[in-house]
């Protein structure tokens, strides 16, 4: 029997007593977002809308985006990436599980020095694809040209943010490249592997958010 979205007690600032609210609503109040499904229009609008709202509410506090996704639509993923570069707060990107295809592109889009992968996470990058077989010849040629432009743009972003030469990234994207957290750090996709933070903070305060859950 599915349990649905868990509810947790949360005291809204100004209220005397805690009320039961959806877990995700509590996390949103703590500036913590989740990308845990295929990247399509609905989840893209959801995440980008929250990023804009949180930026308006407080432009100084960081936003945390947890990622566990196999990727999805190219344009939708680029919309999330562009929003991350536009909003005022720094955005932590944290990979747990897997960040594949466009999800790895979003992981890459976090604030430099604030891109994190959990120790057993997997990251995969490859080139964008399109369903050519559905198009007639003129449409096929136009789609190939557009896809080539998008591929070059994505490759340039990977090269710029990882520090790898353009040709290296281009060759790697010819196939599915799976990386461990340590390999992704060496490649430049992330800056920190989670166990490094645990080792550093094991005898001090919580690793992520010292002020988190203060109203629970």
UniProtKB/Swiss-Prot annotation:
Cellular component terms per the entry's GO annotation: chloroplast stroma; endopeptidase Clp complex
Record-linked InterPro entries: ClpP, ClpP/crotonase-like_dom_sf, ClpP/TepA, ClpP_His_AS, ClpP_Ser_AS
CDD domains, per database record: S14_ClpP_2
EC number: 3.4.21.92
Catalysed conversion reaction: Hydrolysis of proteins to small peptides in the presence of ATP and magnesium. alpha-casein is the usual test substrate. In the absence of ATP, only oligopeptides shorter than five residues are hydrolyzed (such as succinyl-Leu-Tyr-|-NHMec, and Leu-Tyr-Leu-|-Tyr-Trp, in which cleavage of the -Tyr-|-Leu- and -Tyr-|-Trp bonds also occurs)
Keyword Protease: yes
Molecular-function GO term, any one: ATPase binding
Signal peptide: none
Entry annotation: catalytic residues: 101 (nucleophile), 126
Subcellular location: Plastid, Chloroplast stroma
Primary localisation category: plastid
Subunit structure: Component of the chloroplastic Clp protease core complex.
Stated family: Belongs to the peptidase S14 family.
Task performed by this protein: Cleaves peptides in various proteins in a process that requires ATP hydrolysis. Has a chymotrypsin-like activity. Plays a major role in the degradation of misfolded proteins.
Stated name of the protein: ATP-dependent Clp protease proteolytic subunit
Organism encoding this protein: Zea mays (Maize)
């Amino acid at each position: 029997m599915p349990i649905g979205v868990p509810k947790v007690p949360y005291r809204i600032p100004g209220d005397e007593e805690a009320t039961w609210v959806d877990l995700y609503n509590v996390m949103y109040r703590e500036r913590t977002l989740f990308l845990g499904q295929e990247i399509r229009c609905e989840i893209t609008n959801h995440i980008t809308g929250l990023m804009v709202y949180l930026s308006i509410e407080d432009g100084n506090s960081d936003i945390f985006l947890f990622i566990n996704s196999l990727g999805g639509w190219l344009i939708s993923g680029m919309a999330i990436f562009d929003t991350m570069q536009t909003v005022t707060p720094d955005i932590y990107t944290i990979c747990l599980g897997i960040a594949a295809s466009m999800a790895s592109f979003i992981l890459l889009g976090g604030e430099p020095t604030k891109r994190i992968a959990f120790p057993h996470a997997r990251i995969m990058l490859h080139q964008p694809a399109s369903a050519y077989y559905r198009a007639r010849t003129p449409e096929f040629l136009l789609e190939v040209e557009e896809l080539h432009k998008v591929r070059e743009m994505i490759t340039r972003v990977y090269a710029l943010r990882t520090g790898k030469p353009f040709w290296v990234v281009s060759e790697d994207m010819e196939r599915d490249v799976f990386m461990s957290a340590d390999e992704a750090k060496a490649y430049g996709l992330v800056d920190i592997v989670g166990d490094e933070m645990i080792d550093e903070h094991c005898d001090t305060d919580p690793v992520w958010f010292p002020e988190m859950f203060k109203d629970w």
